[in-house]
Regions:
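Nucleotide and nucleotide-moiety/phosphate-recognizing core
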Residues: 2-136, 142-149, 157-176, 192-198
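An accessory alpha-helical subdomain
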Residues: 151-152, 180
């Protein structure tokens, strides 16, 4: 069994932005998805992309899978990725997060120990779509999916969790850009400003 894998969630319905967020072009000229792959491929031997639009992603050099349990949002995607993964520990990220920091990902991996979940927490809020999940999560997630309890925060509350606080995060990502996601056209404009400030 490989030590770690990555899972990209690309199953959102894009209700607030009129295009597939994974293929939005960044100021660098790359799409969000290509930027994400460039980061993850340097760290993980296996990358799984979970989507409900499989045909759009077959050209990429990743394992593309569809939700095992349909219509369950991010929880269904994480569950599916864990089921397909060959690794005990798996880094999960959404496809609309354009600034993921490889050093921060490595910090989560370093802290994995025997925990079910290693997750950043800033101002009392956790980041479930930039976190590390163990295959040990599968039974709890399945139970929650069966009961239609789909809130990631509630699922995480049932598991053994290591939280990474702002002080540790700030060493690698002081602006917390890793957690910035694109939901609207305004977010794209805001991203350019944030990237300029980070230079």
């Amino acid at each position: 069994m490989k030590k770690t894998s990555a899972i990209i969630l690309a199953g959102g319905k894009n209700t607030r932005i009129a295009r597939n967020k994974a293929f939005i072009q960044l100021p660098t000229g790359e799409t969000i998805l290509q930027n994400t792959l460039n980061v993850l491929q340097r760290i993980f031997p296996q990358i799984i992309l979970v989507t409900n639009q499989k045909e759009f992603y077959l050209k990429f050099n990743v394992q593309v899978v569809e939700d095992l349990i349909k219509g369950c949002g991010p929880l269904g995607g994480v569950f599916t990725g864990l089921c397909y993964s060959v690794s005990k520990h798996n880094f999960v990220v959404a496809c609309d997060m354009p600034c993921i920091n490889p050093a921060l990902i490595r910090l989560l991996l370093k802290e994995r120990g025997t925990y079910d979940v290693v997750i950043p927490e800033v101002d009392g809020e956790v980041e479930p779509l930039f976190a590390l999940y163990s295959k040990n999560c599968i039974p709890v997630m399945f139970e929650c999916l069966q009961g239609r309890n789909l809130k990631m925060s509630e699922v995480i509350g049932k598991l053994q969790v290591k939280k990474i606080g702002a002080k540790e995060i700030d060493r690698f990502d002081p602006q917390h850009l890793s957690f910035f996601n694109i939901n609207t056209e305004e977010d794209l404009k805001s991203l350019q400003i944030k990237m300029d400030q980070a230079k």
